[in-house]
Curated annotation (Swiss-Prot):
This is Arginine--tRNA ligase. InterPro entries: aa-tRNA-synth_I_CS (IPR001412), Arg-tRNA-ligase (IPR001278), Arg-tRNA-synth_N (IPR005148), Arg-tRNA-synth_N_sf (IPR036695), ArgRS_core (IPR035684), DALR_anticod-bd (IPR008909), Rossmann-like_a/b/a_fold (IPR014729), tRNAsynth_Ia_anticodon-bd (IPR009080). The keyword Metal-binding does not apply. GO terms for cellular component: cytoplasm. Its EC number is 6.1.1.19. It is found in: Cytoplasm. It comes from Neorickettsia sennetsu (strain ATCC VR-367 / Miyayama). Gene3D superfamilies: Arginyl tRNA synthetase N-terminal domain, HUPs, Isoleucyl-tRNA Synthetase, Domain 1. The lineage of its organism: Bacteria, Pseudomonadati, Pseudomonadota, Alphaproteobacteria, Rickettsiales. Monomer.
Amino acid sequence: MDLFLRLGNVLTEVVTSIFGVTLSEQVLLWNSPKKREYGDFSTAISFLIAKEVRLSLHEVACSIADGLRSFKDLFKNVSVASGGFINVFLTSDTWSEFLAAVSDDAGGYGFSDIGHAVPLNLEFVSANPTGPLHLGHIRGAVLFDIFAELLDKFGFSLTREYYINDAGKQIDLLVYSVFVRFCEQLRKKESDNFPSNCYAGDYIRDIASYLISTFPDSVKDTTELKSFSDTFREVILSLTMDMIKSDLAKLGISYDCYVREKELHEGNYIEKVIAVLDEKGYLDEEELPSPKGKSGDWVERRQKVFLSTKFGDDTNRALQKVDGSWTYFASDVAYHYHKLERGFNHMIVGLGADHAGYVKRLSGVVEALSGGDARIDIKLYNLVNLFRNGKPVKLSKRNGDLITLDDVLESGITVSEIRFAMLTKSSEIVLDFDLDKFVRASYDNPLFYVQYAHARCSSLLRKRGPSAKCDAAMLVEKQELDLMVTLAKLPSLLKVIVVSGEVHKLTFYLHEVAERFHALWNAGMIENKFRFIIEDEPELTNARLILVKAVKNTLASVLKVMKIEPAERM
């Protein structure tokens, strides 16, 4: 039951009937008032309407309040504050209906079909296949996997996609790194001067050993880099992608589709999209300024460019190098043309914050290719700083100090704790991941705090289950009313998250629900009147147990969309 939507529909009906004004985004028209004594909910709609109809704020607020008072089955009290806000208290029947609905909904509270099976492509992680994932990748993987779960729940026809960048210089460097270790192992002696620009993790040694033991007949013919690359490049790529897929599987993440950059090259997609952009008038040749850090030896030459400045970018972007080869950006353009060709007019891409410069250029590409009929939402996420024993652990993908998912799991952290931790801050903010905090069974551990609330609910319901009938009129304590209002926020909050992608708000909401529940539990430890089960007050006990069941279902609904199993006992 979406209580905010119901209130929004009523408010829309009242405003339209009185002023002839049509409202949008009904779920956002109601909020919690600053002080609980003002009401269950509050709206500032009078401020918007007064400007449009050119009447005084007080006059508009009073007219709307009178209209709301006609819905006697919904509102117990409607008042106008001096500032023009309209505050309402709901009837006990409304709250009874709400609690009954949520307590009966064991798996789907908060979700609705707003996607209507619209095709949507969500591309995320897409890390270069040069080794196992680091924590920055893991943060993006978890964020967008949970976002994908939400999009599924809200009825979108979602395709989870991974783009394999397997045609660039990083793969050449990966192959060379393995080749160096391969030659060392054949000589049975490691060099003290391993190239500093190479990938130096232990997994490089493991790949080299695998090649020698698995393909003994090919070893003697691959002691030169070219022959080695021709023979083993695809094998090495397969092995590193298996590492990535293994890490993702441990996190509970899978994909519907993998697209290889190499296949786009082989299918001449770059040439195809260049022709399309040229025909549409979005190509030119011009001399571009030197890249950052290369001004000393930079020689200006004319290059084929995409006119991204037409779409708000600060410079046009090179598609072809002076030697005739295509730029990395040209592959990106071809890839998004490939998405459009597959019928995706709505795309979401998750990128690291270091790719912020891609937002305008990729948005421009999609607009240029689709004529404005398709849209792309590029959502950025920041780095992760890992702490052990209060000391930061540096992350690096190219040296032996690489911190992998297995390293974190071996420290005692569970996958559920990792998934929760990745959402404890906005994705735009650098995340400090404190391993010590998440292994402690205490309120300092944010997942423990939430799971303990769910386990307490389960414990109460094992002792006594509520009857079917709920009388919310029995729930009059401030802590109870605060908790009910918080539960009612979930459906509208989830809709906001589906639009914005701000999935960290899930953990913030879980903490708020748990905090209000623990407050009520702790009050019962001090005063008997706050206890959930009071033997000589069966009606109050039943109402409180229905509230407990609603809390349990709400916590479970959000935890499950995060792929975290709610704890029944702790």
